[in-house]
């Protein structure tokens, strides 16, 4: 179902369901022979949610038991898991680097089923603020509580839609705009209209003193090329059909949740506003972590740039 200005969702529908897909990929990677990342809570989330398209990523045995489906989408599922594993590692290393530099205030925007507040070794005194839709945060908190999980930092949940005045909610929850902050906007930008993307980074910039850090992933140049869009749409249709045959559930069209609009280049914008920013392509990131780079542009993941930035002292 296409997006609307005031849409909302639970964890198993619309944008919320994409968080389960990411968690499923993290679960599969964690349980693989040589995992790049370790997320002990990813499987907990997936099991609590029940069956859905995410089952195809979280349970490789499903594909192994259906050779005709595995032959159609098995390689693409592996590509998605590799992408999510490297994406997770990128943001993990970003946060650990910021912590090593002395940052003790962290904001995870559109946190979804991000479990870093529970699994990363945060230094004493670290406060992690998580912002997302109320029902998404409720699902995550309840699921982790039922499994006896304890945060490894002071955790502040802020249930809010990022299209609303989230800076005010953040400040009301104790956020200190005078302290350096590590910000992440992981897997978020594609789900925002172009103007909302601009506003997001304007707000982050306003709340970030010298010493702050920022990481995000954004669409790569050329992502609106009509041939590329058509091929990726066809590939996603094949994957949805395969998942539907495996779990007998109608799958949402994830690409309908994205806003296909021309966007401000984030790394350039940050550089113009006093940040030192660098960008890495998804292909470069896969190579860095020793994962194969797909030899075509028809995979399930559109071309992506990973941006990291630091605001130095004036």
From Swiss-Prot:
Functional note: Exhibits S-adenosyl-L-methionine-dependent methyltransferase activity.
Official protein name in the record: Putative S-adenosyl-L-methionine-dependent methyltransferase MUL_4402
EC number: 2.1.1.-
Transmembrane segments: none
InterPro entries: Ppm1/Ppm2/Tcmp (IPR007213), SAM-dependent_MTases_sf (IPR029063), SAM_mthyl_Trfase_ML2640-like (IPR011610)
Family that this chain belongs to: Belongs to the UPF0677 family.
Ligand binding (S-adenosyl-L-methionine): 132, 161-162
Enzyme class: transferase
Molecular function in Gene Ontology: methyltransferase activity
Pfam families assigned: LCM
Lineage of the organism: Bacteria, Bacillati, Actinomycetota, Actinomycetes, Mycobacteriales
Chain coiled-coil ranges: none
GO biological process, one term: methylation
Annotated region described as Disordered, given as residue ranges: 291-314
Keywords: Methyltransferase, S-adenosyl-L-methionine, Transferase
Superkingdom of source: Bacteria
Natural source organism: Mycobacterium ulcerans (strain Agy99)
């Amino acid at each position: 179902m296409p997006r609307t200005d005031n849409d909302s969702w639970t964890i198993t529908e619309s944008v919320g369901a994409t968080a389960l897909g990411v968690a499923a990929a993290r679960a599969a990677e964690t349980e693989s022979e040589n995992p790049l990342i370790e997320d002990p809570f990813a499987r907990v989330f997936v099991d609590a949610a029940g069956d859905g398209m995410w089952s195809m990523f979280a349970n490789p045995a499903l594909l192994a038991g259906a050779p005709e489906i595995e032959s159609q989408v098995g390689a693409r599922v592996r590509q998605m898991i590799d992408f999510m594993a490297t994406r997770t590692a990128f943001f993990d290393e970003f946060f650990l680097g910021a912590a090593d530099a002395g940052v003790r205030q962290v904001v995870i925007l559109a946190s979804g089923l991000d479990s870093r507040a529970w699994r990363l070794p945060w230094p004493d005194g670290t406060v992690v603020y998580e912002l997302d839709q109320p029902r998404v945060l409720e699902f995550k908190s309840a699921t982790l509580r039922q499994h006896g999980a304890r945060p490894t930092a002071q955790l502040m949940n802020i249930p809010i839609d990022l299209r609303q005045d989230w800076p005010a909610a953040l400040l009301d929850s104790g956020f200190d705009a005078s302290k350096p902050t590590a910000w992440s906007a992981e897997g978020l930008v594609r789900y925002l209209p172009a103007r909302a993307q601009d506003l997001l980074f304007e707000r982050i910039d306003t709340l970030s003193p010298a010493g702050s850090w920022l990481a995000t992933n954004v669409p790569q140049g050329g992502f609106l090329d009509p041939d590329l869009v058509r091929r990726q749409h066809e590939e996603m249709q094949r994957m949805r059909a395969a998942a539907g045959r495996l779990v007998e559930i109608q799958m949402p069209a994830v690409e309908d949740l994205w806003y296909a609009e021309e966007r401000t280049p984030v790394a350039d914008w940050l550089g113009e506003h006093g940040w030192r920013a660098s960008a890495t392509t998804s292909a470069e990131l896969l190579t860095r972590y020793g994962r194969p780079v797909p030899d075509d542009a028809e995979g399930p993941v559109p071309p992506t740039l990973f941006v990291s930035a630091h605001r130095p002292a004036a």
